């Protein structure tokens, strides 16, 4: 074989290999893009968010129409249980997004290393900085709603309306208060944080005085608030925004959220991209959509929380039945966690 023929042989061989290599890559890319899992976004969340009256179903429809992805919600119980499941699956991640972690458990999520930082497009323009600050500046969680914790009071009950957390320890409220378990429920944990913020190292003394007045400690918000609506007790831990739902759908102002002069702790709920998510691009698309005007407009009349997107106008029922406390308190999550352990031991004995 002469040099010319030899050159042509090697040239053709190299070109052939390049073409085959290109075909191989394209085949792999095509196979990957045809993977049905990459067309689906799986989101872990809590029960009330995807209940028949929650925002989940409408957000799913809007997201699928806007993006072409399919959205699968997975009910994990209450907020703390959502985190627990994600941590258990850390080495075998099944979901793409976790939704419903709040400022009282966000540090635990960060410490567990289950979240990947992602800042949605236009987040700085849409979400107020003070709301963002509640979840930190790492953007492992994107705020989607917020409200202050409050005791919801039934004005048709035979007990007076409390004016402070201290009032709740009075004998007149014996077995009149419904709380939620702080080990499984974010409102339950939020109430503990509220007591820590006000009583500090005396918080256990407060709970000793409060103990006789607790009717039950429900596993989650849905079950606890359900008992309240059935008339089992005249007081339940919830949010300052909760009475607006009764004004809007029950046409009643029977239930109110008294504002305490001492102040209230705030809950900011967030959603985050799970590290190792099977569909990372789909997860990012979901987080981008979650803070959009279209998704956020669903929040007020289904989630009964303030939308994180400041451009979304609140309905009239919020203006008449969702008071805004003048003083926002905060508590160290580590101190709150320690208090939870001590409080649950106290209540068990």
Task: Describe each region flagged by the PLM.
Residues 1-41, 349:
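Short, low-complexity disordered leader/linker segments with a strong preference
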Residues 116-125, 140-142, 166-169, 248, ...:
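Short beta-strand->loop
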Residues 150-157, 196, 267-282, 289-290, ...:
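A bilobed periplasmic-binding-protein/Venus flytrap-type ligand-binding module shared by bacterial periplasmic
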Residues 193-258:
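Ligand-binding pocket segment of bilobal, Venus flytrap-like solute-binding proteins
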């Amino acid at each position: 074989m002469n040099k010319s023929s030899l050159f042509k042989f090697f040239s053709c061989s190299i070109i052939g290999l390049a073409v085959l290599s290109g075909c191989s890559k394209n085949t792999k890319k095509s196979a990957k893009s045809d993977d049905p899992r990459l067309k689906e976004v799986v989101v872990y969340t809590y029960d009330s968010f995807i209940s028949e009256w929650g925002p989940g179903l409408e957000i799913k429809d809007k997201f699928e129409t806007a993006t072409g992805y399919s959205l699968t919600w997975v009910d994990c119980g209450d907020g703390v249980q959502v985190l627990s499941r994600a941590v258990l699956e850390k080495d075998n991640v099944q979901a793409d997004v976790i939704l419903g972690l709040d400022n009282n458990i966000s540090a635990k999520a960060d410490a567990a290393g289950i979240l990947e930082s992602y800042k949605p497009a236009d987040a700085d323009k849409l979400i107020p900085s003070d709301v963002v600050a509640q979840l930190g500046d790492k953007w492992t969680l994107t705020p989607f709603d917020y409200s202050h914790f409050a005791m919801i009071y039934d004005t048709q009950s035979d007990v007076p309306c409390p004016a402070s957390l201290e009032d709740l320890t009075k004998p007149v409220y014996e077995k009149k208060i419904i709380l939620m378990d702080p080990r499984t429920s974010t409102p339950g944990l939020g109430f503990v944080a509220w007591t820590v913020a006000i009583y500090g190292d005396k918080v256990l003394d407060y709970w000793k005085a409060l103990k006789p007045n607790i009717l039950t400690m429900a596993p989650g918000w849905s079950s606890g608030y359900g008992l309240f609506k059935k008339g089992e007790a005249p007081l339940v831990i919830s949010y300052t925004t909760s009475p607006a739902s009764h004004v809007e759908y029950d046409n009643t102002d029977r239930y109110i959220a008294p504002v305490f002069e001492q102040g209230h702790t705030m809950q900011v709920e967030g959603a985050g991209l799970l590290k190792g998510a099977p569909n990372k691009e789909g997860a990012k698309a979901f987080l981008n959509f979650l803070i959009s005007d279209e998704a956020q407009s669903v929040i007020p009349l289904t989630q009964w929380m303030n939308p994180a997107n400041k451009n979304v106008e609140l309905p009239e029922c919020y203006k008449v039945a969702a008071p805004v406390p003048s003083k926002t308190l905060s508590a160290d999550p580590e101190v709150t966690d320690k208090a939870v352990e001590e409080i649950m031991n106290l209540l068990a004995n």
